[in-house]
Amino acid sequence: MKSSSNGLLAQVSIAHLVSHLHIMTVPAMLPLLPDAMQVSFVELGIAIGLFNIVSALVQAPLGFLVDRLGARRMLMAALLLGTVSFGLVAAFPSYPYLLAAMILAGLANGVYHPADYSLLSRGIPPKRMGRAFSIHTFAGFLGSALAPPIMIGVALATAPRWSFAIAAIAGLMAWAVMVIIGSPLPDKKQNNGVTEPRGAEARPITTPVMTLAVLTLLFTLLSLSTGAIEKFSVSALVQGFDVALPAANLALTIFLFASAFGVLAGGVLADRTDKHGYVAAGAFALAAFIVVLVIRMPLPPVALATALGVTGFLTGLVAPSRDMLVRAASPAGAEGRTFGIVSTGFNVGGVIGPILFGFLLDRGLASGVLWAAVGFMVATTAVVLLQERHMQMKPAPAG
């Protein structure tokens, strides 16, 4: 069982790494694409927003398809579709084709979270679930961290189209790995040794609507909080803080790598405490304070990279607890649907954020991008504290 669950975790984590590499492909090249494609930051924000609109529209229905058709089959199809989307813009590097590619990539992105978490929930023993979620999320954050140096490096050495080609090749390689290794789960109905009841796929979700709404709002705020830094901080630092592009890109890369290692630490923490709301609130409050320091104090490159690194570690720390909260709210056999619904919050934030942050950059309000990140972090802190208090006030189950 352990070897099969490890194989499952490896495959799902590789796919998650590629999905985040794809998410960050366009944002990583934001400093270069306006000149390369003769477009504004707002137009690029619209392209990123389109990706998220499509993902938001399809993620919940795709979650139902994941539970009905099989998570692994859907995951492999998503990897192929992502490969096609970035291959398209590599072949035809223009803004109209970028928009078309973002539609296809958004459709593929709508599969990843429902499929990944459905596979993990069915194939990982409960006692290892917190660490499994942290490894899976670490892989995604690692994909985000690899995007800036790879995409910017390839684009500067050759041309942006070859960065899109690299993204396409990564998707194809992940698909090939899944084909070669095969399925670690012999029975689609197997759920950690427990057979799902007949008709589980058609069972409606029983999670309270308010719980789903709060979790979706939390995902939205998390997307807005970290998205400002992940996708627009390099352009903001270069434009508004006179930071050289290599130094800004290094600071972002350290932020992303630190986020990934924060996830691993968060996995251990998630298995040792049930006070997930207080952990998240403390981490985001401290992260907001550090970003304020970045805005208000001129920092040399090393100090800037250190500050963003600590910020990244803190924001990564809460990810496994976030995933455990959603799994706890998911009825058995409906993990794909539940994660599909609440993960739309990422896409809602992904629609609002790029257009807002692109607008601020086009208006020369670069510091506004970082101030927005602070505001969304404070809002995230408030939401998780309110949710924690609500959970503590709920009566304990009888017996």
List where the protein language model places each region.
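Helix-to-loop junctions at the C-terminal end of transmembrane segments
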Residues: 58-70, 263-275, 361
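Residue-level signature of mid-helix packing/kink "hotspots" within the transmembrane helices
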Residues: 24, 52-60, 144-145, 256-260, ...
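C-terminal transmembrane helical hairpin of 12-TM major facilitator-type secondary transporters
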Residues: 276-322
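Extracytoplasmic gate region of multi-pass secondary transporters
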Residues: 26-27, 210-256, 260
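Cytoplasmic membrane-interface "Motif A"-like loop-to-helix N-cap segments
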Residues: 68-79, 272-284
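Conserved MFS/SLC helix-loop-helix module at the cytosolic interface between two early adjacent transmembrane helices
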Residues: 57-93
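Helix-loop-helix hairpin linking two adjacent transmembrane segments in secondary transporters
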Residues: 136-186
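Cytoplasmic helix-loop-helix junction between adjacent transmembrane helices
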Residues: 101-140
